């Protein structure tokens, strides 16, 4: 498994991303990644999507679309959060898929599971790829939900035990 990651590291362009949004306000992390701008200097508690995005701005989305990529968003939670519908339209996404885009999802602690999300991500990629010419690329921005709070939820089964550390 790790040899695959080692190979990816040797064969791809990669780096590190730092986000000034830690422990909440997920939309600010998205904003920083997609725009390259920092939220560190915004007023405390502000969310860029709700306050500052009122017109089209240059983003990773627009840059990739200028290079012939399709641009889709997959977010398996409700579309009503953080003014995302308006913002992602202004960012230039061709297609946005939300929790309400699907009849049923698999959940854990009330949130869509990563497994379900990744299966849909693969389906979306294959669908987008089939619709593209060979020289066109596919960009899909995927926001997962399973890692959101509620960690004390009583539906977890302890399946891994380490001797001497009970």
Where are these regions (language model features)?
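Solvent-exposed soluble domains appended to multi-pass membrane proteins
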Residues: 1-166
């Amino acid at each position: 498994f790790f040899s695959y990651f080692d190979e990816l590291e040797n064969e791809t362009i990669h780096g590190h991303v730092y986000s000034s949004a830690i422990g909440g306000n997920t939309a600010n992390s998205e904003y920083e990644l997609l725009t390259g701008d920092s939220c560190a200097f915004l007023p405390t508690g502000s969310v860029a999507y709700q306050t500052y995005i009122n017109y089209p701005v240059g983003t990773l989305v627009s840059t990739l679309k200028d290079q012939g990529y399709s641009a889709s968003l997959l977010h398996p939670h409700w579309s009503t959060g953080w003014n995302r519908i308006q913002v992602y339209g202004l960012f230039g996404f061709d297609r946005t898929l939300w929790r309400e885009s699907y009849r049923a999802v698999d959940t854990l602690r009330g949130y869509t599971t990563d497994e379900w999300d990744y299966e849909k991500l693969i389906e979306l990629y294959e669908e987008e790829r089939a619709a593209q010419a060979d020289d066109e690329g596919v960009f899909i921005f995927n926001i997962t939900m399973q890692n959101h709070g509620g960690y004390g939820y009583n539906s977890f089964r302890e399946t891994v035990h380490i001797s001497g550390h009970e």
